[in-house]
């Protein structure tokens, strides 16, 4: 029934202050107030309606996206929103669009790689959206292997221009968001060739379309790559292809902060350290980890609320059935995902700090922590996006058959999110980057060089290689030192084992290729340790609010002990713990599920998501699921008439046994 909170009993069970938890989740009271205000602004604006996306054709969906983006920019100007508020507005509109790449990739690329003069020229246009840009790096034939890109930029000293060319079909730019139909400009990555020498991949600002009528400029072939997975979902984005046929651009449209080409064609590296590029990479990957927390928490919110509403089995003598959330099988699948959402939130907060720290160090020409920061962000991008994609799908299954409906919000959320496993670095390739860094760190352990940052634990190798867990009872697994030591010992021992196995090969690169699977597992162990350690570090902070810290403590140990359970083979094979201690960890995990159970709905309420943002019948705040499922069903175009279109031509002949005479 309308106006009734079907989840009121669940909310009354909460043992903590939800309003205070909202502040913790948001990161600060200021961040909460901004998000809350902007989320409600978006939810109340009819232009940002999105419940009909699955029923739109691709063209209709794309046109609605253009409308929403224009309306959003208009509102930003009218309300004089600052950069933070504008970012939250785009976030809560919740529809992949060209603006994501314009603000998220095109503008940062110019800021990071353009000279002051170039920034002044191009950013003044981009910030007013007088030009719209994208980031054209990935090609049909190369993605992860950036050095394998084939597009060329050959300097012509006669005209003081670069000639941008696509020499082969596989050199076509393929996938850049915003490229297919919208972008007027792109930062194009190509092989810089001058005086007959190839200087590798560099960025160039290239105009693609006329600013008068939006038609492609001469010798440029550009379009959309086609429909992608899911209804609605990422099909609102014009991922595109792009080919150049000897397109000429002025020399000063090469991004020249890190290197330049003179009028005479001489290639000159600048005094600016090339490592600055990694600072931008740390920033981008930090935002991806934050997005992982957002996406997973949405799925968990839907699955938790619906699990509390749904009842199946367990009725005795005509009594009420059991809430699905009360089954331990449901808790064992759901609560670790709830814990993961919080864990990723806090490691994302830490990555923001890391980005600031790296930026300050780079400004002071201090590159000591850069390799570790680069490996760390690569690994966490991989870990969190993989876990989130898998977690969204698990939440769909947790909602049973109804989770398969588009109106559950979960199929579209999955289709929108899953590309994160391959964009900005394929997840397996990224973990191999982490593995190379770990092998280098292990090799230096005997040289006196002290590991730093997230690898600092390796400096205690002598202890971690021989220590044994002292756990004797289940409650011992609530000791942060015990948990950290187990995860540190596991990560170190897996890395050392890989290093020893590598040393058996005369050709180290051949050995690396042979041991790829083991190296990925070692990298994952290291990254999971980072997340666990940052969650524990969060608990060491001063966190106010009735019962808030207690709930976070429970979630922290659910996250850690579930990982221990899931990767038990690692912990046992490296002799970090005994089978008996593993059994005690499972006992403690079940106890934690029991403690979280009465707080589960309140813990997802703390995400403070509006029904508009969730866009889920199953995850409604009021829990009024079943009537709304019927409402959504009746909105489907198939229900516009009681007799389907096509009955006379195709169905009636079958039913009337008239197929032989029917004109099909």
UniProtKB/Swiss-Prot annotation:
Disulphide bond pairs: 467-576
UniProt-listed Enzyme Commission number(s): 1.3.3.6
Catalyzed reaction equations: a 2,3-saturated acyl-CoA + O2 = a (2E)-enoyl-CoA + H2O2
Cofactor binding, note field: Binds 1 FAD per subunit.
Tissue: Expressed mainly in flowers and young seedlings. Lower expression in roots, leaves and bracts.
Induction trigger: Induced by dehydration, abscisic acid (ABA) and jasmonic acid (JA), and locally and systemically by wounding.
Cofactor: FAD
GO biological processes: fatty acid beta-oxidation; jasmonic acid biosynthetic process; long-chain fatty acid metabolic process; response to fungus; response to wounding
Family, similarity comment: Belongs to the acyl-CoA oxidase family.
Assembly: Homodimer.
Protein name: Peroxisomal acyl-coenzyme A oxidase 1
Name of the gene: ACX1
């Amino acid at each position: 029934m309308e106006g009734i909170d079907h989840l009121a009993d669940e909310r009354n069970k909460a043992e903590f202050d939800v309003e205070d938890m909202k502040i913790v989740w948001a990161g600060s009271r200021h961040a909460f107030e901004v998000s809350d205000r902007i989320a409600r602004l978006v939810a109340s604006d009819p232009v940002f309606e999105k419940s009909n996306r699955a029923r739109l054709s691709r063209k209709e969906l794309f046109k609605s996206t253009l409308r929403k983006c224009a309306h959003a920019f208009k509102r930003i100007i009218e309300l004089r929103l600052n950069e933070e508020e504008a970012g939250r507005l785009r976030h809560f509109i919740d529809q992949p669009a060209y603006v994501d790449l314009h603000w998220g990739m095109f503008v940062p690329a110019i800021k990071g790689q353009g000279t002051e003069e170039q920034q002044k020229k191009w950013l003044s246009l981009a910030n007013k959206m007088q030009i719209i840009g994208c980031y054209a790096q990935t090609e049909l034939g190369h993605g992860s292997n950036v050095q394998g890109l084939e597009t060329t930029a050959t300097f012509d000293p006669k005209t003081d221009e670069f000639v941008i060319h696509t020499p082969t079909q596989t050199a076509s730019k393929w996938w850049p968001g915003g490229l297919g139909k919208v972008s007027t400009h792109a930062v194009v990555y190509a092989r810089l060739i001058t005086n007959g020498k190839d200087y590798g991949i560099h960025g160039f600002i290239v105009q693609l379309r006329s600013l008068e009528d939006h038609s492609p400029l001469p010798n440029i072939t550009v379009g959309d790559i086609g429909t992608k997975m899911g209804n609605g979902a990422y099909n609102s984005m014009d991922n595109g292809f792009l080919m150049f046929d000897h397109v000429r651009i002025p020399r000063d449209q090469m991004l020249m902060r890190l290197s330049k080409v003179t009028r005479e064609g001489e290639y000159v590296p600048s005094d600016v350290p090339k490592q600055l590029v990694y600072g931008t990479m740390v920033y981008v990957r930090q935002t991806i980890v934050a997005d992982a927390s957002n996406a997973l928490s949405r799925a968990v919110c839907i699955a938790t609320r619906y699990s509390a509403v749904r009842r199946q089995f367990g009725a005795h003598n005509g009594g009420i059935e059991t809430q699905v959330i009360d089954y331990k099988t449901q808790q064992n699948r759901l609560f670790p995902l709830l814990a993961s959402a919080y864990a990723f939130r806090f490691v994302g907060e830490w990555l923001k700090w890391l980005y600031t720290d790296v930026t300050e160090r780079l400004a002071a020409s201090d590159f000591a922590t850069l390799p570790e920061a680069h490996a760390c962000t690569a690994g966490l991008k991989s870990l969190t996006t993989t876990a989130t994609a898998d977690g969204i799908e698990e939440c769909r299954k947790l909602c049973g058959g109804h989770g398969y409906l588009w109106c559950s919000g979960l199929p579209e959320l999955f289709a929108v999110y899953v590309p994160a496993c391959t964009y900005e670095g394929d997840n397996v390739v990224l973990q191999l980057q982490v593995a190379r860094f770990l092998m280098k760190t292990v090799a230096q352990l005997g040289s006196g060089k002290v590991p730093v940052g997230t690898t600092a634990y390796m400096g205690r190798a002598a202890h971690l290689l021989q220590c044994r867990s002292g756990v004797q009872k289940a409650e011992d697994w609530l000791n942060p030192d015990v948990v950290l030591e187990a995860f540190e010992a596991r990560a170190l021992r897996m890395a050392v084992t890989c290093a020893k196995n590598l040393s058996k090969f005369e050709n180290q690169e051949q050995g690396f290729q042979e041991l790829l699977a083991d190296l990925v597992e070692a990298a994952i162990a290291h990254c999971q340790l980072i997340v666990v350690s940052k969650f524990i570090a969060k608990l060491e902070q001063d966190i106010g609010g009735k019962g808030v810290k207690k709930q976070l403590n429970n979630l922290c140990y659910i996250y850690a002990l579930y990982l221990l359970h899931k990767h038990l083979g690692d912990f046992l094979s490296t002799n970090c713990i005994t089978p008996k201690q593993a059994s005690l960890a499972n006992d403690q995990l079940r106890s934690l599920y029991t403690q979280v159970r009465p707080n589960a709905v309140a813990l997802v309420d703390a995400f403070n998501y509006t029904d508009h943002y969730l866009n889920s019948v199953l995850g409604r705040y009021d829990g009024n699921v079943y009537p709304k499922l019927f409402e959504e069903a009746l909105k489907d175009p198939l229900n516009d008439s009681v007799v389907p279109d096509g009955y006379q031509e195709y169905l009636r002949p079958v039913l009337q046994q008239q197929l032989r005479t029917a004109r099909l």
